[in-house]
Amino acid sequence: MDNIEPPFSGNIHAETEVKKEEKKKMKKESVSLMGLFSAADNVDYFLMFLGGLGTCIHGGTLPLFFVFFGGMLDSLGKLSTDPNAISSRVSQNALYLVYLGLVNLVSAWIGVACWMQTGERQTARLRINYLKSILAKDITFFDTEARDSNFIFHISSDAILVQDAIGDKTGHVLRYLCQFIAGFVIGFLSVWQLTLLTLGVVPLIAIAGGGYAIVMSTISEKSEAAYADAGKVAEEVMSQVRTVYAFVGEEKAVKSYSNSLKKALKLSKRSGLAKGLGVGLTYSLLFCAWALLFWYASLLVRHGKTNGAKAFTTILNVIYSGFALGQAVPSLSAISKGRVAAANIFKMIGNNNLESSERLENGTTLQNVVGKIEFCGVSFAYPSRPNMVFENLSFTIHSGKTFAFVGPSGSGKSTIISMVQRFYEPRSGEILLDGNDIKNLKLKWLREQMGLVSQEPALFATTIASNILLGKEKANMDQIIEAAKAANADSFIKSLPNGYNTQVGEGGTQLSGGQKQRIAIARAVLRNPKILLLDEATSALDAESEKIVQQALDNVMEKRTTIVIAHRLSTIRNVDKIVVLRDGQVRETGSHSELISRGGDYATLVNCQDTEPQENLRSVMYESCRSQAGSYSSRRVFSSRRTSSFREDQEKTEKDSKGEDLISSSSMIWELIKLNAPEWLYALLGSIGAVLAGSQPALFSMGLAYVLTTFYSPFPSLIKREVDKVAIIFVGAGIVTAPIYILQHYFYTLMGERLTSRVRLSLFSAILSNEIGWFDLDENNTGSLTSILAADATLVRSAIADRLSTIVQNLSLTITALALAFFYSWRVAAVVTACFPLLIAASLTEQLFLKGFGGDYTRAYSRATSLAREAISNIRTVAAFSAEKQISEQFTCELSKPTKSALLRGHISGFGYGLSQCLAFCSYALGLWYISVLIKRNETNFEDSIKSFMVLLVTAYSVAETLALTPDIVKGTQALGSVFRVLHRETEIPPDQPNSRLVTHIKGDIEFRNVSFAYPTRPEIAIFKNLNLRVSAGKSLAVVGPSGSGKSTVIGLIMRFYDPSNGNLCIDGHDIKSVNLRSLRKKLALVQQEPALFSTSIHENIKYGNENASEAEIIEAAKAANAHEFISRMEEGYMTHVGDKGVQLSGGQKQRVAIARAVLKDPSVLLLDEATSALDTSAEKQVQEALDKLMKGRTTILVAHRLSTIRKADTIVVLHKGKVVEKGSHRELVSKSDGFYKKLTSLQEAV
């Protein structure tokens, strides 16, 4: 759009401000400019030619407009000399403007539509080729070269940068370059002297604006980093809110968050000062430049070198052409970023290893697969690690037999499966299938003979049926159902609302761990493989489901060669042969009974997993923290309580809904004003600056019009005197402009930042006052709450504080301009005001043009990006099932919708853009033609009509700028709703209830009296019905039962994460509802199955249990948890930073730090939820001994899955369907042959 914005319209700061550049995640290599378009085909070349032609013509229309505009002004100035002849000339020029507008319409339409379409087409092709190249790589690539690569960033963010460069931004550059060239050519042809002088002053304004942009970018980066630090604090606290509540860490969290916000607030003062100074200095230079140009133009006019209109429009032409070059800079920057981004994409596509892709199809196939596998002298080391995994390893797996591999962590069990699938090649030796080296076999065919079930199932964000279908592409629905039945999945699938068409969510998040595993088993079963590869396939199932699925797997394994990787030895007792690996060598082979009788490594492993073998108590993992695959976890504590897998959305509680209904927009604004009350003085001072700044453009336009009309005076001395006067006034205005803008921006920025900090801190405190049930709601997940804290709080500031500055400024401008316009010529003012909708539309579409019409690319491609992310993160599953082609086709399908919509969107955007500019040109023509009519009728004069016309042009663009803020204001108002929804909510479980009992000591008597409970997110599913349970002070109570029986819920209720719906939960005879919650939690210590650590040092994480603990006490706690030794071995010892959520520590190390934290708390009641699950056998024994000591004299509740951990408990209760079905000691319960507990121990029987 050729929006002809007046050279002083109050929004230069909007043009000169630049967005903060993204952090440089990409390498500095870039493709050539032509290389950027290397994905183009013939259709794209035609589109680019047509689009380039359109944008070039479009760029030349504005300079031509000024030629006709100047001709009309000159005719109007001379109208009194020959009214009829000159009026005809005005009409002719007006018609030329209309024709030029039509050219603008067509050229803009073609330019926008063609560039958008070709950008979409080329980038879609790049995305597809990039994903295909990644999927064609072998696993070695992902272990070595790809470790530091961010493929998803390249396929999403980098591709968007390339699309932006190829599409919108290339068109922008061509348009502005053509405008620049045409403008200066016309300028030199019109008044070359004035063009040279204008060319000299424009760079000064550009330098000032550029310097301001650089300073603001630097400050913004620092401010953004400060807010990012605060966001990290909030995200970490909310993602681990149960740990924060359990250790009464709310106050510490708020203090940490507040300290992070203070850093950002300090930067806001510099930001406001820099903005005010930058904008003010730019306008000051603009005033002075116009003063100089007026003076020189008057000199040329007086000496007959040019006329007033030509001088005036030449200045405008050259200034706008110079600014066009400046407007091209962001687009050139975007193209530069696109070239760098394209280099990352083309590097992958261009370097696509032919061997990696060809070997999928090259090689021989066997007519009949028997299934005999031989390792002959195989030596191997991972490409990413120099240590040898195997050295001269040899063994034979006979066809149709089941071989299980066991051994300690790092012995190479999973490596065997990887090498059989040919993920890796041996350094020496051979791997044979039916006597044929697998190197010589067609890789895709080889993998089609195998079915893999991994320990951690990988599902894709599509339907259950599609996930099973991955095992066999052309299978029918009956085959899918049969496979699901074999995996014990059919019954739960059919119970879902959409059955097999149920969407599983990204990564299968809508399914439980056991459900995901059964889908993965069904996928392998569907393949009907000759060779079955099972890597702890039943690890995620509860005991009852495990038994059924194991039976199904036993049936599937018949007559198939099967390799089983075993952690839980109960899963391999019936296999044909067990191979024990240690240090990369086969130490023992034989059946289960043979190996037990030998008393070797296998027997040792069995004994480590069963300290009371004569009672057949359990079968457990002897290595629960595998470095390759991560620790086994059957569930996350409490986290699955958020929703059932596929429940319908629950209505919000009546209280929340009622509270939200009461919050109207007006009341929210009023409440925000009250929240911002401490800054009323800042608002007043900022508003004074905004009013003064707003009045300047109108007065500036009056000065322009006055000088222009003065140029047509017949008296040279009058021209000199009046123009000199205006020039001096402009210089004076330039001097006072900087202080005015500093006043406006400094105080408004300070007001906004202080408001943001106050809103964020209030929000954070309010969030941490809510009960856990509130966090369980989908809308209150960590991501949503973090967004409210960051994005919504920023939107409130942006919409209310930042935008208020512009609104006040433009309101001042509008009032001033309308008053002046109607004062000088109400007729002209009425006609031009009637054209305001057209002028406003032109301005708004011009702003859209600068941003680009492509819309939110990230959102448009979200589904495709999600699919790519899943495929790449689960590359082993994709490779194992030879699903590269399926994934690529599905990815292409996901890209097709945004690609098709680009055509329609391009035409709509281009036509709307061109039409608005055409109508703007017609509006100018109408206004000037009408002035000629009025002058001819003697109803106005040239001077007054031009003043009215010029001042209203400024007003139109200020109104457009204000209207452009409407979406931001609407977003801000909506954000207020999110903010006050949290601030107004009253928690169901107050942490500091008035009149509650403060406890300084508790004995530890705990009693459940007729407790009924259902999770708030699933009120229709009762967890407990009249539960009665008691543990005496100082005694231990173990809670066992099948999945979903309510074991973890017992701990949740004791911690008062939730309240019973009926009945009472008492501690020391007092209902815990009457006890001050924070004082109660100080006497309780929780150790969860998955330890939650904070991103700080080990020392600080342990000290979280007791802020007043001494160094000696911290060390003693670590020793008690068997953590001191590994901590001391670290380079920085206790000051070692654990990383985000403890990623720098292994699972076992994290658990021991968590146990040390609980030890330091010295609690009266200890709550252990599988506290030793993440430890290896040796560490588990030591930590269990430490916990046994810690439990002495304390009331202890143990939630147990691994029954070995509870054999010493004073009392064991078995829960089933929310009720206590058995109670007694371990010996008492195992003596009941038909009891629930006995059945559980039998299911976990290892020997």
From Swiss-Prot:
The UniProt entry, under SUPFAM superfamilies, shows:
ABC transporter transmembrane region (SSF90123), P-loop containing nucleoside triphosphate hydrolases (SSF52540)
Q: Does the keyword ATP-binding apply?
A: yes
Q: Which organism does this record belong to?
A: Arabidopsis thaliana
- Residues noted as binding ATP 1 in the record, renumbered to the chain: 407-414
From the record, give the transmembrane residue ranges. 49-69, 95-115, 172-192, 196-216, 277-297, 315-335, 680-700, 727-747, 807-824, 830-850, 915-935, 949-969
InterPro entries per the UniProt record, alphabetical: AAA+_ATPase (IPR003593), ABC1_TM_dom (IPR011527), ABC1_TM_sf (IPR036640), ABC_transporter-like_ATP-bd (IPR003439), ABC_transporter-like_CS (IPR017871), P-loop_NTPase (IPR027417), Type_1_exporter (IPR039421)
Any idea what this protein is called?
ABC transporter B family member 14
A Pfam family cross-referenced in the UniProt record is ABC_tran
Keyword Acetylation in the entry? The reply is no
**Glycan attachment points:** 362, 392, 780, 938, 1010, 1108
Q: What is the lineage of its organism?
A: Eukaryota, Viridiplantae, Streptophyta, Embryophyta, Tracheophyta
Regarding the membrane, this protein is recorded as: Multi-pass membrane protein
